[in-house]
UniProtKB/Swiss-Prot annotation:
HAMAP family according to UniProt: IolG
Keywords (A to Z) from UniProt: NAD, Oxidoreductase
GO biological process terms on file: inositol catabolic process
Subunit structure: Homotetramer.
Enzyme class: oxidoreductase
Organism (species): Streptomyces avermitilis (strain ATCC 31267 / DSM 46492 / JCM 5070 / NBRC 14893 / NCIMB 12804 / NRRL 8165 / MA-4680)
Protein name stated in the entry: Inositol 2-dehydrogenase
Length: 343
């Protein structure tokens, strides 16, 4: 392996451009070796000012570019399966943004392909596991100081939804973060989901079922509820409260400034997930680069990506039917160990 890990970045949109900046100026030990995006001009703009970066419009060309030793996938979800399989065929370690693959059948194909390799190559970008507040909550729950977790209360609010955002995407794009966070925090698989749909907000685009209230059941008997509101109009908020047998703990309130002035006080609200979770993204990519340079894969696994896809699909069915839906996972390959919820 070279002195600097050569990374091919697939996708040069909002997320891809942010990762290109991160690899170039924030994370040590890596460099952007190649970028692929169907819109070549967008890729060229994302790497402007960087030396030695090869720009391509095809995934295969970027993966085969000189100096490429690892892959960061930040393209739209439907392109992920092909890119992951191409990386596997070349033996390249991958950090893949969520969703790993949008549908559970495709996600299972990734799990099975990696299992046939007999070694992990893929890490999925569930960045909340790298957020300082979430890491502190995980450590506290694992310590047992508050007793057994009984419930998680989660809040997920966005300023507004982008064009083309559908009611199903509230579950499989937004709540997918809470799906993985709940599995990781509790160390339990989610076994059933119910979705309640209040009257849509006046701020929601016509036809969008926003907000929604999602209730998950877990294998260990805990409950997880999620309020998802993607057209709040005021900011990006993510909160989580764990209610345990001997106490409770809440995160998500303390990451912005509290301003006091004449007549009162107010707290600023982040406007974008890249602002709220900037440090988490930095930590995630830094740890991935360091582990890859050691020949290891340590973060959320392809199994985690598959499980999130299965739960999200059950959530969309519950949203459509109004019924409680159970979650059925395929048998877990031995590659992912006795404790399937990694990191």
């Amino acid at each position: 392996m070279s002195q600097l890990l050569g990374v091919a970045v697939l996708g040069a949109g909002h997320m891809g451009a942010d990762h290109i900046r991160r690899l170039d100026s924030v994370v040590s030990g890596a460099r952007v070796a190649a970028v692929a995006d169907p819109a070549k001009e967008r890729a060229e703009e994302a790497v402007a000012g960087l030396d030695g970066v090869l720009v391509h419009t095809e995934v295969a060309a970027a993966l085969d570019a000189p100096g490429v030793e690892a892959v960061l996938i930040a393209s739209p979800g439907p392109a992920h399966e092909e890119a992951l399989l191409a990386a596997f065929a070349r033996g390249l370690p991958v950090l893949c943004e969520k969703p790993m693959v949008p549908d559970s059948a495709g996600a299972l194909r990734i799990v099975e392909a990696e299992a046939r390799l007999g070694r992990r190559l893929a890490q999925v970008g569930f960045m909340r596991r790298y957020d300082a507040e979430y890491m502190g909550l995980k450590s506290l729950l694992d310590s047992g100081r508050l007793g057994r977790p009984l419930m998680l209360h989660c809040t997920h609010r966005n300023v507004s939804s982008p064009p083309g955002f559908t009611s199903a995407m509230l579950i499989n794009s937004s709540v997918s973060h809470e799906i993985d966070a709940a599995r990781w925090l509790l160390g339990q698989e989610l076994t059933a989901v119910t979705v309640l749909r209040p009257r849509p907000s006046a701020h929601a685009p016509e036809g969008l079922l926003d907000p929604q209230f999602v209730l998950f059941e877990t294998a260990g008997g805990a409950l997880v509820d999620v309020e998802i509101l993607v057209n709040s109009g005021f900011g990006y908020q993510v909160r989580c409260e764990a209610v345990c047998e001997a106490g409770s703990v809440r995160i998500g309130d303390a990451h912005t400034m509290v301003v006091t002035s004449a007549g009162g006080a107010y707290q600023e609200v982040a406007q974008d997930y890249l602002v709220r979770f900037a440090d988490a993204y930095d930590r995630e990519v830094r740890e991935w680069v360091d582990a890859t340079r050691r020949g290891q894969v340590t973060g959320p696994s392809a199994w985690d990506g598959y499980a999130a896809s299965v739960v999200a699909e059950a959530g969309v069915r519950a949203q459509d039917t109004g019924d409680r839906m159970t979650v059925e996972l395929a048998p877990r390959p031995d590659l992912y160990g006795q404790n399937p919820i990694s990191r």
